[in-house]
Amino acid sequence: CQAMALAKMKTAEIPGNSGSDFPGLVIGLFCGWTLSMEKFHNLLARYGITEADLTGMDIPAGKNILELFTAGGLLCVPMAEVDHCVRTACRYCMDSTAEFADLSVGAARFGTDCEEMRGWNQIIVRSDRGKELIELAVAKQVLQLREASAQALRELKRAAAEKKKKALKNIVEKSRSAKNL
């Protein structure tokens, strides 16, 4: 949603907006939703931890859990408990892959063993500027690439399409009619 908002700001006719104040390169993240911090803090409190205790988080593919990493170990929270922490606006957002970014990045570990893919991200290059950055990072040996499988790409497209369908359904329900869109 941030990449989409930035694209709208770049193209909007706003008095005094020359467009030169915008970044030259936009890197967007894959995102299905984000959490309300207040609700997330309450969820953590139910498990006896705070945000400061967290050293990492992950949502492993196919496990339907949120992994919370702390110095004391791993805590697995069922996604059903996390769902009520999702920000309302996310239920209406149709862009799960930062379609308006120069580069879209995310840990979509479809089509392969989840454990094998930890630490890897998928990248979608969406512009010449994005391609130049990736090529530079590879040349400087700060980025290692490997080809995503055809199955992984199909699954990513399926998940993105499903997010769009759910969001559109929620928008229609909220507006009480598709004619109001």
Regions found by a protein language model. Give the residues of each.
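Iron-sulfur-associated redox domains of electron-transfer enzymes in respiratory
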Residues: 2-181
